[in-house]
Amino acid sequence: MQYADEREEAPRSGEIRFDPCAVADGQSANFVTMVPRDSDLLPPVILLETTADQCPSRVSDAAVQSELTTLVNQIEAHSGKPAILAPVEEFEAAYAPSRRFDRQLWLTRSWVEPDYASRPWLMWTANRWYKTEAAQEPLRWVVVRP
């Protein structure tokens, strides 16, 4: 991502896709390398899209929760801002991050308002495949709660 070139265009943030099969230290090291420490950036987003069911070797729920806690702490220490957690429904059902972390939530469910988290969402991806002439690729249609 070219932050210097895009600073004038729109507010930016760093996103990281949590991998429950990998330790947090390596994941946060990649984030710290790619995302500058800049107070003008929006809060970082941690995408929680994959459960440990896809890992090549067994990873316990406790290990996933521990590594996620470590990742959240490291990302927030780097950014200086609380992270926004973006769990998909399957991840929320498996690990309940909306109960474990007092952070803003970005939920995803096409067309129907998501109700799978323990708290209200700040952001909602209402359509992941929105097509418009304004873009060559499908866009995410995101609703922000006032």
Feature names for model-found ranges:
Residues T70-Q74, A83, R99:
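Metal-dependent DNA replication initiation modules
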Residues R100-P146:
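Functionally critical loop-and-helix segments that line ligand-binding/catalytic clefts
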Residues F18-P20, E49-T51, V88-E90, S110-V112, ...:
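Active-site beta-loop-alpha junctions enriched in small/polar residues
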Residues M1-V72, E76-H78:
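Substrate-binding cleft of extracellular glycoside hydrolase catalytic domains
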Residues A24, D53-R58, E92-P97, Y116-A117, ...:
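Extracytoplasmic/secreted cell-surface and envelope-processing proteins
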Residues S79-A93:
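Aromatic-lined carbohydrate-recognition surfaces of secreted/lumenal glycan-active proteins
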Residues V32-I46, T50, A96-P120:
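Structural recognition of alpha->loop->beta junctions
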Residues R12-R17, L42-L48, A83-A86, Q104-L107, ...:
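Structural recognition of the beta-strand scaffold that forms the well-ordered cores
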